[in-house]
A protein has these predicted regions:
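N-terminal hydrophobic targeting signals that begin at the initiator methionine
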Residues: 1-2
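Hydrophobic membrane-insertion alpha-helices, especially the h-region
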Residues: 5-19
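Hydrophobic single-pass membrane-insertion segments
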Residues: 16-28
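N-terminal "domain-start" segment that seeds a small globular fold
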Residues: 26-60, 144
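Amphipathic alpha-helical repeat scaffolds
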Residues: 51, 71-75
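Proline/glycine-enriched tight loop/beta-turn segments at coil->beta junctions
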Residues: 62-67
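Structural microenvironment flanking redox-active thiols in thiol-disulfide oxidoreductases
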Residues: 78-143
Length: 146
């Protein structure tokens, strides 16, 4: 009787796992974007942005490299990502470009000026990767890269 209970419990667990796996797999495989974008990689290289220092940066200078675009904020719970981004920059800078766009769009977590942001990033995280001026990343005024 004891073995019967153990075997029944084992098969019950397998059936529950199988049902859960099937549900998750089928649900995820059916997810499709609900928007259509006219954006393509060629149009990316036609964009530009103003660096945190005030210089115009043409994105065509990034051709031939992988580009990681990330919105950042100094008072965000993910602020320590600057360490990871700087690590990636140092390790892969010959083939990876990191573009940091400070944004105050989410919970007002980037209240400082561009000067404050640059000082914070350099003094606390030694950021050397490309940073841009504070930018909207959502809404009508968002930068075209977003």
């Amino acid at each position: 009787m004891k073995w019967f209970i153990i075997i029944s419990a084992f098969f019950s667990i397998i059936m529950i796992f199988n049902s859960f796996y099937s549900f998750v797999f089928n649900s995820v495989s059916e997810i499709k974007p609900n928007y259509k974008s006219d954006f393509n990689s060629d149009s990316f290289y036609n964009l530009h942005a103003i660096s945190i220092d005030g210089d115009k940066i043409d994105f065509k200078t990034f051709k031939g490299k992988k580009v990681l675009i990330v919105n950042v904020a100094s008072e965000c719970g993910y602020t320590n990502q600057y360490d990871d981004l700087q690590y990636l920059h140092r390790k892969y800078s010959n083939r990876l470009v990191i573009l940091g766009f400070p944004s105050n769009n989410f919970g007002k977590q980037e209240p400082g000026s561009n000067v404050n942001i640059l000082e914070f990033c350099q003094s606390n995280f030694g950021v050397e990767f490309q940073m841009f001026q504070k930018t909207d990343v959502i809404g009508e005024n968002s930068h075209p890269v977003y």
